[in-house]
Amino acid sequence: MSCYGGRPAMEEHRTMRGVNPAVIIGTPGRMNDHLRKRNFDTRFVTALVIDEFDKCLEFGFHDEMAEVIGQLPALKKRVLLSATDAEEIPQFAGVGGEASGNAASSSRVIKLNFLPEEAVSERLNLQKVISPEKDKLETLYRLLCTLGDHSTLVFVNYRESVERVVSYLKSKKFPCDAFHGGMEQDDRERALYKFRNGSCPVLVSTDLAARGLDIPGIDNVVHYHIPVNEEAFTHRNGRTARWEARGSSFILLHAEERLPDYIPEDIPVFGLQEQTPKPAKPRWTTLYIGKGKKDKLNKVDIVGFLYKKGGLVREDVGQVDVQEH
């Protein structure tokens, strides 16, 4: 089960007691809240995985992570996942022999490196799009119309830019959603849900979506703003061409803009059509029903209703999820 802020902790507590989950995934702050209240039995927690460990440190979660680890006495395995190679692992993590104060752990520390040697994957088609104007909104719109209904992540550098881009695209009747850290948790989840299921083909985001967002089948990444550094560029591109899939990455430039050193100068130019196609309609539409498991509602009920009352057939119905409420 998942635990995070932005929603009542009591609902998570009830789920823990009722389900007795084998795996709990949570943010440091919310995990500490449950640990302090003893909402689950720590005697049976033997493995801990900290994802995005480098970013957690960068964002100042040192004390919260140390508190989580300090309340798990039965740990036998600790896994630290990071997109960058740390020179030193903090002592609180409890790995690394002398650093952890545990001599027995030094012989059991294993480092695995899954980073590709090449900066840009061979499965990623990297191209640049030239905008005749410094304000690249119209060029972005034309590019997205050309890409059709394929799932596309548009990256910008600021929250305000997310809102501006989304407002412009929607004024042109282009289906899209916003995603950034200033949004309410429910709004972010709703945007991700629609993007995942194909009812919203374009998600405009800050670099918040560049790490930790695992959505299979993203076809394109668009850099509306040039990334602040090479690391951000790599993580943005990593949202597409995942595993064995192929994908495309487009860099929007105006005539006076220059590529940074970490991006090859000789990447091909993607030419836009003179006649811009109309915005493609999404393949799916998300239908929200204000009932859930608490109301004894299940997938069979929903599908039956859509068949009988909506006149739909099997091919018309996509993913059906029933939440607790």
Predicted segments, located by residue:
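Conserved helicase ATPase core of P-loop NTP-dependent helicases/translocases
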Residues: 11-15, 163-167, 175-206
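Non-catalytic terminal extensions of ATP-dependent helicases
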Residues: 272-325
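Post-DEXD/H (motif II) to motif III coupling segment of the RecA-like Helicase ATP-binding lobe
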Residues: 40-119, 263-264
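Conserved interdomain hinge at the start of the Helicase C-terminal
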Residues: 122-168, 311
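Conserved segment of the helicase C-terminal RecA-like domain
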Residues: 229-232, 237-269
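Conserved nucleic-acid-binding Ia/Ib motif block in the N-terminal RecA-like helicase ATPase lobe
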Residues: 1-36, 44-47, 167-171, 175-179
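Conserved two-lobed SF2 helicase motor
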Residues: 19-35, 192-211
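A short beta-strand element within the Helicase C-terminal
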Residues: 211-226, 248-251
